[in-house]
Amino acid sequence: MIKATPAEEKGEMDRSEKMTETIIRNAYRVTLSEISPVDISELEFEDWVRDFCKNGCRSYNSSWACPPAVGTLEECRERCLQYGNMMLFDKCYKLSGSFDSIGVQNAMSDFKLIVDRYAELLSPILSRSLFLTNEGCTRCAECTWPDAPCRFPEKLHHTIEGYGFNITKMARRAGLHYNGGPNTVTFFGAVLYDI
C-alpha cells in the first residue's frame, strides 16, 4: 500500500477547501441566503415524506423531477451515497402578507432559476454533481412523463422532498433557518458532488 506524503495530503485538503470556498462563494453570488455542508452518512430517506408527496402534492406521478420517476427511496439512497459531499442551501423571500400566494409562486419560480444558475456555475468545475430543488419541475408547460423521455435531461433537478428528505430536520442539523419569520417563504435545495 502506498501512503500519501504529508505534502500530497495537504495538497488534496487544500484543493478540497478551495473547492468548498468556491461552492459557497458561488452560492452567495447567485443570491442564495444560506448554505451548509451535510454529512452524507447521516442522510435519512423517510417513507412518510415520500407518502406526503404521493398524497399531498399535485406534481406526484406527473413529472420526471418527482416520484415515482426519480426512483424508489432505495434507488434515491444509492444515488446519493455515490457522492462524497453535499451542501444544503436556501433562499428566503419576503412576502406582502401571510396570504400572498402570488408572491409564493413568484418566489418559487425565482428559486428554480437561481438553482439553474448555480448549477451552470458549479457543474463545469465539479467532477460530478446532482442538484435537488423544491417541488416539481415547471420547465415545460406539460411534462412528457411517463410517455416520452425528458426534453431537457441535462437541466432536470429532482425534488429534494421526493428523495424522502425531511427538510425541517435537515435544515436544523445543518444550522440553516427553516422559517425566515413572518411574511416570508423559504425554499431549499441541495447539491451532491465530487471534486
Task: Indicate residue ranges for each PLM-predicted region.
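Catalytic cores of enzyme domains
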Residues: 3-4, 33-62, 67-195
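TRNA-binding/sensing appendages of the translation machinery
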Residues: 12-38
